[in-house]
Swiss-Prot record:
Transmembrane domains' residue ranges: 4-24, 37-57, 80-100, 113-130, 134-154, 167-187, 208-228, 242-262, 272-292, 305-325, 330-350, 386-406, 416-436, 462-482
Cellular compartment(s): Plastid, Chloroplast thylakoid membrane
Protein name in UniProt: NAD(P)H-quinone oxidoreductase chain 4, chloroplastic
Keyword Chloroplast among UniProt keywords: yes
Gene Ontology molecular function: any one: NADH dehydrogenase (ubiquinone) activity
Protein's organism: Nuphar advena (Common spatterdock)
Recorded name of the encoding gene: ndhD
GO CC term, one of those recorded: chloroplast thylakoid membrane
Reactions performed catalytically: a plastoquinone + NADH + (n+1) H(+)(in) = a plastoquinol + NAD(+) + n H(+)(out); a plastoquinone + NADPH + (n+1) H(+)(in) = a plastoquinol + NADP(+) + n H(+)(out)
Amino acid sequence: MSDFYWLTIIVVLPISAGSLIALLPHRGNKVVRWYTICICLFELLLTTYVFCYHFQLDDPLIQLEEDFNWINLFDFHWRLGIDGLSIGPILLTGFITTLATSAARPVTRNSRLFHFLMLAMYSGQIGLFSSRDLLLFFIMWELELIPVYLLLSMWGGKKRLYSATKFILYTAGGSIFLLMGVLGMGLYGSNEPKLNFETLANQSYPVALEIIFYFGFLIAYAVKSPIIPLHTWLPDTHGEAHYSTCMLLAGILLKMGAYGLVRINMELLPHAHSIFSPWLMIVGTIQIIYAASTSLGQRNLKKRIAYSSVSHMGFIIIGISSITDAGLNGAILQIISHGFIGAALFFLAGTSYDRIRLRYLNEMGGIAILMPRIFTMFSSFSMASLALPGMSGFVAELVIFLGIITSPKYLVVSKILITFVMAIGMILTPIYSLSMSRQMFYGYRLFNVPNSYFVDSGPREIFILICILLPIIGIGIYPDFVLSLSVDKVEAILSNYFHG
């Protein structure tokens, strides 16, 4: 137990401060926007302070633990704690949410509700990454759904209600399996529920039951991550959502599924994970090729970027299913890396749409001359997406490759085959990425359009993009900055597989 309730403050602060937005003076949106940005900044600085001064990197155990008895009736606790696995996603959440809030400047309709929902999402995400209780994990998982649904259905495009309904049906359907898994694991073997992660990690199950639990959790994470074939909500959602919502979806929401896969399926159900991992490896490999090929055929700019996100999630799945130090560390690095790259690409797609009012790539062309700053930044992030050496994506994918090659679990032939197919996926990535840049920025098509409203990126947008670009290059040059956070925890998780 920590001396001071740092994590509770970090989790509760955004939603508590968000509920005070209603008390702000009715003088336009500026006050609300700056208030929200200040809350996000303060939260990010507080989180960074706590991690710098109250967290030991070389300790793989849970730190800053807090445990309050919440509901006596069935022994439900408010149980929080962080380790090397959760520290990266929490800092990523703070960083991306702060930038997404400042990106939401064009939102003027119902801006109070919009900013409150963003802060509510912030609390839910940090709560999920720091929860140490299975039921609390589920509650935080569900807390995300309502803000995202409202952000989609109220501030989306023309088909926003369709995409919002599709999102809620998919994710709520997945959550049913998550709840069944939570209750099954919590109630197994006794009348008293056992929901503490530490207790559950030492619990053994019959193999058949463990597989059922694993499969239930896997479906919930497959929807959120997404893993094919449960990915079809994602392109529609990204295609219609406002770009600040897209930044949160691509940067953080998709990473919750991958985090859950490591935190619950790998850590609490190691035998089932060992059985499922070859199948996950096959699905991840197919996903890289399928999503990259499908992305190439998309006319809608945001849908093309959405499919590229699905393709990149394939690398994370492969890293997790390799069951090696390098593979799992690479997957965690890819979670952080793609959080930055995905958020930046959706922000650029949204700001471009604000100016040219065109969604489809075949209607665009020649923007490079009219908007050189947007062209430069888009090219930079496209290069980051296709894993250019010196940027974070390259290191993450390289470490995942190393993880597969060194994995003792798989035969040499299967490792060569998987590596070969992944390499084809890495060749397809620059094809759809560079063809997207070519269709948008080169040619002469838009010179015929009256271009009085073609204004290049302003200082605010350039600032947001540079804030995202710097960590991408920083991680690419010195990946140990992120890897050092998780390396001890990864060893602790994998000890279940080699000594358990």
